[in-house]
């Protein structure tokens, strides 16, 4: 059996050290702020980045193009390895299509290689949780094909439960409609968002006040997890660590004390959510 590598986009929003320790190659998206373009997770610190957003600075993101995708994948094929790429949701970006185009071109140049690109229909640490599960399967000795089959069967079981301070950033980035954005700007109303079966963000409710919105995404996670054993729950935040830690404690209390990984949301996805976002990701009932 040929050796294979698992690659991801930077939108997994996992700590760089975590990815490095596990030898996971990462293809970064980019963001531009104040006329400067940076790779995701590079340039500004999370605190610096979100402070700029709070001050009204705009951050614009760009997707991966096929040439960049090819440059990342080809070295592994030259080494005689097969490749599985877990791509950022096609419902939020054209990155998946760029990865797919590059893979099709590379398949002609490397006919003996297996190159699989999967549209995860996930984002942020939802992608990260999927990667966590995939690495477990690889450690268990599963083949490339077995892992790809598992991902396709289970990717819609990655639940995304999100609350934001307001929806203006998501609207500006084209991730939600103007109507939804207006809905979320009511005084003290905090939107509740999830990822649907098409990998798109949908506003599904509202709560009055921050604490209620944080409790709501935990309650959603508890309901989704019925019948599922979660050894790992992931939580991301937009420069609001106290809120993330509050959510983590409630998750541990209600879900049997799973391991919880907390990390800042990345600069690319954070460009669209804005500061103050908190999200919980876990395996659960199908979206």
Residue ranges and their predicted role:
Residues 2-5, 11-25, 30-32, 92-95, ...:
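Mixed-charge interfacial surface used for oligomerization/domain docking
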Residues 5-68:
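N-terminal glycine-rich anion-binding loop in soluble enzyme alpha/beta folds
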Residues 68-99:
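N-terminal glycine-rich phosphate/adenylate-binding segment common to multiple enzyme folds
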Residues 87, 116-117:
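A glycine-rich beta-strand to alpha-helix segment
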């Amino acid at each position: 059996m040929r050796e294979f590598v698992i690659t991801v986009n930077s939108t997994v929003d996992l700590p760089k050290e975590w990815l490095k320790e596990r030898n996971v190659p990462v293809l970064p998206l980019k963001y531009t702020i104040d006329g400067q373009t940076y790779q995701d997770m590079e340039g500004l610190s999370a605190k610096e980045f979100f402070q700029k957003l709070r001050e009204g600075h705009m951050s614009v993101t760009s997707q991966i193009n096929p040439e960049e995708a090819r440059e990342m994948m080809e070295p592994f094929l030259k080494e005689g390895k097969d490749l599985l790429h877990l791509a950022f949701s096609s419902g939020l970006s054209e990155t998946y299509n760029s990865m797919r185009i590059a893979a099709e071109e590379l398949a002609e140049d490397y006919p003996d290689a297996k190159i699989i690109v999967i549209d995860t229909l996930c984002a942020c640490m939802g992608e990260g949780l999927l990667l966590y599960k995939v690495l477990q399967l690889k450690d268990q000795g599963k083949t490339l094909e077995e892992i790809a089959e598992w991902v396709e069967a289970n990717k819609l079981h990655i639940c995304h439960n999100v609350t934001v301070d307001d929806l203006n950033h998501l609207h500006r980035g084209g991730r939600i409609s103007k109507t939804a954005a207006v809905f979320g700007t009511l005084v003290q109303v905090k939107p509740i968002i999830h990822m649907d079966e098409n990998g798109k963000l949908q506003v599904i409710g509202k709560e009055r006040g921050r604490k209620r919105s944080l409790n709501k995404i935990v309650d959603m996670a508890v309901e989704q997890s019925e019948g599922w054993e979660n050894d790992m729950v992931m939580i991301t935040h937009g420069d609001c660590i106290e809120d993330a830690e509050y959510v983590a404690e409630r998750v541990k209390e209600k879900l049997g004390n799973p391991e919880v990984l907390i990390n800042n949301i990345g600069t690319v996805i954070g460009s669209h959510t804005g500061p103050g976002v908190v999200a919980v990701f876990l395996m659960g009932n199908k979206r």
